[in-house]
């Protein structure tokens, strides 16, 4: 496998998922540092395997899109069987790593993976709401990190953090979809257009970003983030509000990529 073939695993997206797990782990007081690395590695490897299987399932769509036609499967550099084997190997490894924290973390990992592959992936072809539905699986990595550190999965604190990551994903991936709208139309994938009407897309991006900032500002009230840190993290989406214009969407997307690492850092320093 060449360096170019690593796109099968989408390493940057896998790392973002691992960082989200670190954010959840950081919420647990006095959690062991060793399990933090388990959360990062286990979730990232699991996400890499999920990306590989997703590309096997969507290889027909990838051939139609300019952005994805140079991936290993559309190019013919890897067979679907080989890509499936590599994906399953990553998934098995990721689940084994997560099992170091007991049965709950790998169970949650399996649920997130099943939601991504069995719910989001087929719905992506059928409905524009798939983007919001798929965000559920992306909200689970913080919960996995939390349970690895010994937290209960139903605790209100981790539910709040998972909700914040859900709010982050929708504008983040919506902007990504809008940047590649022509590709999506070429492949026949319905575009997510929340509240389409006279208000226009900029209004709805601002609405999601405002909700994200407000949720972050709630964290100190529950003792989940140092009061001095919350305004700085909330500033990431708030500072983007004035530039919510079509020509600024690439900048918005890139800036929103910084949100999970900043959240994880703020929670680690609380």
UniProtKB/Swiss-Prot annotation:
Q: Which CDD domains match?
A: PT_UbiA_Cox10
Query: What protein name applies here?
Result: Protoheme IX farnesyltransferase
A molecular function annotated in GO for this UniProt entry is: protoheme IX farnesyltransferase activity
Q: Which InterPro entries match?
A: Protohaem_IX_farnesylTrfase (IPR006369), UbiA_prenyltransferase (IPR000537), UbiA_prenylTrfase_CS (IPR030470), UbiA_sf (IPR044878)
Q: In which pathway does it act?
A: Porphyrin-containing compound metabolism; heme O biosynthesis; heme O from protoheme: step 1/1
EC class, as a word, reads: transferase
Concerning Pfam families, the annotation shows:
UbiA
| Membrane topology classification | Multi-pass membrane protein
This protein's UniProt keywords: Cell inner membrane, Cell membrane, Heme biosynthesis, Membrane, Transferase, Transmembrane, Transmembrane helix
* One BP term from GO: heme biosynthetic process
What's the superkingdom here? Bacteria
What's the miscellaneous note? Carbon 2 of the heme B porphyrin ring is defined according to the Fischer nomenclature.
Main function: Converts heme B (protoheme IX) to heme O by substitution of the vinyl group on carbon 2 of heme B porphyrin ring with a hydroxyethyl farnesyl side group.
Subcellular location per UniProt equals:
Cell inner membrane
Its gene is: ctaB
By sequence similarity, the record places it as follows: Belongs to the UbiA prenyltransferase family. Protoheme IX farnesyltransferase subfamily.
Q: Give TM segment ranges.
A: 13-30, 33-53, 95-115, 129-149, 156-176, 207-227, 249-269
Where does it sit, as one GO cellular component term?
plasma membrane
The UniProt catalytic activity note for this protein reads: heme b + (2E,6E)-farnesyl diphosphate + H2O = Fe(II)-heme o + diphosphate
EC numbers listed for it are 2.5.1.141
Q: What is its main location?
A: membrane
């Amino acid at each position: 496998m060449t360096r170019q073939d690593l796109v099968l695993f989408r390493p940057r997206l896998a790392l973002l998922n691992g960082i989200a797990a670190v954010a959840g782990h950081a919420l647990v007081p006095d959690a062991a540092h060793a399990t933090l690395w388990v959360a990062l590695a286990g979730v990232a490897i699991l996400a890499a395997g999920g990306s590989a299987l997703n590309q096997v399932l969507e290889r027909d769509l990838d051939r139609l899109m300019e952005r994805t036609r140079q991936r290993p499967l559309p190019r013919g550099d890897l067979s679907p069987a080989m890509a499936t084997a590599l994906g399953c190997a990553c998934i098995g490894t990721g689940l084994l790593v997560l099992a170091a924290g007991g049965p709950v973390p790998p169970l949650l990992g399996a649920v997130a993976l099943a939601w991504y592959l069995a719910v989001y992936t087929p719905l992506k072809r059928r409905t524009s709401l798939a983007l919001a539905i798929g965000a559920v699986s992306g909200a689970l990595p913080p919960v996995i990190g939390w349970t690895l550190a010994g937290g209960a999965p139903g605790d209100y604190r981790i539910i709040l953090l998972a909700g914040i990551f859900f709010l982050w994903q929708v504008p983040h991936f919506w902007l990504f979809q809008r940047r590649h709208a022509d590709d999506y139309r070429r492949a026949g994938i319905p575009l997510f257009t929340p509240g389409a009407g006279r208000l226009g897309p900029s209004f709805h991006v601002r609405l999601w970003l405002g909700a994200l900032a407000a949720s972050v500002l709630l964290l100190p009230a529950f003792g989940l983030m140092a009061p001095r840190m919350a305004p700085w993290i909330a500033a990431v989406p708030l500072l983007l509000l004035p530039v919510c214009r079509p020509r600024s969407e690439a900048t918005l997307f890139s800036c929103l990529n910084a949100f999970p690492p900043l959240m994880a850092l703020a929670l680690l320093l609380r």
